[in-house]
Design a protein with these regions (language model features):
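A short, N-terminal "cap"/entry segment at the start of jelly-roll beta-barrel domains
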Residues: 2-56, 154-182
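Short histidine-centered beta-strand/loop micro-motifs
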Residues: 48-49, 69-75, 116-118
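Ligand-binding loop in jelly-roll beta-barrel domains
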Residues: 53, 89, 109-135
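Short, conserved beta-strand element in jelly-roll/cupin
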Residues: 59-66, 74-92, 128-131
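Tight coil/turn sites that cap or link beta-strands
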Residues: 65-67, 101-102, 110, 120
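Short acidic-glycine-tyrosine-enriched beta hairpin
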Residues: 87, 94-112
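A contiguous, mid-protein "functional segment" used to position or interact
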Residues: 121-169
């Protein structure tokens, strides 16, 4: 008789068998090999990609400076935010809520939303998108930065207009719609 637990699946289980091609992934947020992306003032570090999770979700470490955050948008996937540091003001279908460190927000697919750091301190969020793909959009429209806390370069008016045009053009490929400010 074995003293360990039986790690094989039961023959009548409805759960698929283990896929030995997939491995445990340990990600360290300060790993210099992770992609650090600057997006109009915010810095996003992809901790887990769709490739890591068989497309099920991605995990992004977001550093949002005072005044930062994305414009109104919506997308055809679920998105959750865990506030790790600071606080953000989230607008969901036109209603504003404040989420502070230790709190979680969940945005259902297709719902218009945005978030904004109205405080005078840095905010840090962990963002989960399911299924994955948003991390690819960020990589296409953003600019690489050195670390997860490196601020992206400041954009002049022309560069910001070019960024917005590029984001608007690529958004549909990533099941995202950028909305007008109310």
């Amino acid at each position: 008789m074995s003293s360990g637990s039986d790690a094989t699946s039961h023959p009548s289980s409805s759960i698929p068998p283990d896929d030995p091609r997939r491995n445990l992934i340990l990600t360290r947020s300060d790993d210099p090999n992770l992609p650090h992306i600057g997006l109009v003032g915010d810095t996003y570090t992809t901790l887990l990609t769709g490739k890591d999770t068989a497309g099920r979700f991605c995990l992004i470490d977001m550093h949002i400076p005072p005044g930062g955050g994305p414009p109104p948008h919506r997308h055809d996937f679920e998105e959750s935010f865990i506030v790790v540091e600071g606080e953000i003001e989230a607008t969901f279908r036109g209603v504003k809520s404040v989420a502070a460190a230790g709190e979680t927000l969940h945005v259902p697919a297709n719902a218009p939303h945005q978030f904004h750091n109205k405080s005078d301190r840095q905010a840090r969020l962990l963002c989960i998108c399911s299924p994955a793909g948003q991390e690819e959009f960020f990589a296409k429209v953003g600019v690489p930065v050195a670390t997860r806390t490196t601020a992206p370069p400041k954009l002049d008016e022309k560069a910001e207009a070019e960024f917005r045009a590029k984001a608007q053009a690529l958004a549909p490929q990533y099941k995202t719609e950028l909305l007008r400010q109310a």
